[in-house]
């Protein structure tokens, strides 16, 4: 008796879940990269901000390598087009597995630029164990990338747990980020 009710509740949730917006600027932060015999380079991740289609020209960032989508899948289904919010596998031509890493981003050429300087609105957790000082070394997690960097507090030298502030994070190596992206600072 509980299973039908559960299924009905799940169906209601699915029907009321908003679809991810298609902003026309697709990007796929790579969480896995591998090579399959007879196919070549395959990358996986969650597609954001736009759609990819078979045949699309793409670039890997921050590497700046150009390629093309030979094939794509979502949940083991071959498709001609993948939409925002879907877990997607891209079979790439022109980019080798050895040239990509977790945290790289596949995008359309000319739509994103890698950056090593992030301007953020930061909310410091109330139960953080220490104050955050200007120029503190941190790790950030954004998309599927992990990077080291330093915090530059704007207008103050110390941020106490529970406080909010605008700050800059100067990264040791570039990432692809868009306005409104969320990140984790450790």
Model-predicted segments: where are they?
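Conserved catalytic-core segments of large NTP-driven translation/proteostasis enzymes
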Residues: 1-128, 165
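C-terminal effector modules of nucleic-acid-centric enzymes and ribosome-associated factors
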Residues: 95-186
């Amino acid at each position: 008796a509980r299973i039908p009710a559960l299924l009905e509740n799940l169906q209601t949730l699915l029907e009321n879940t908003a679809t991810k917006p298609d902003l026309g600027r697709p990007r796929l932060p790579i969480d896995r990269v591998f090579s399959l015999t007879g196919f070549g380079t395959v990358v996986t991740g969650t597609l954001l901000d736009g759609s990819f289609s078979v045949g699309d020209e793409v670039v890997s960032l921050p590497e700046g390598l150009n390629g093309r989508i030979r094939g794509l899948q979502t949940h083991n289904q071959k498709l001609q087009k993948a939409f925002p919010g879907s877990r997607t596998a891209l079979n790439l031509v022109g980019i080798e597995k050895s040239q990509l890493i977790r945290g790289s981003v596949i995008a359309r050429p000319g739509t994103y630029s890698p950056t090593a300087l992030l301007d953020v609105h930061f909310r410091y957790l109330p139960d953080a164990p220490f104050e955050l000082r200007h120029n503190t070394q941190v790790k950030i997690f954004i998309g599927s990338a992990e990077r080291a960097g330093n915090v530059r507090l704007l207008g103050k030298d110390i941020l106490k747990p529970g406080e909010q502030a605008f700050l800059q994070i100067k990264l040791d190596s570039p990432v692809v980020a868009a306005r409104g992206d969320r990140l984790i600072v450790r």
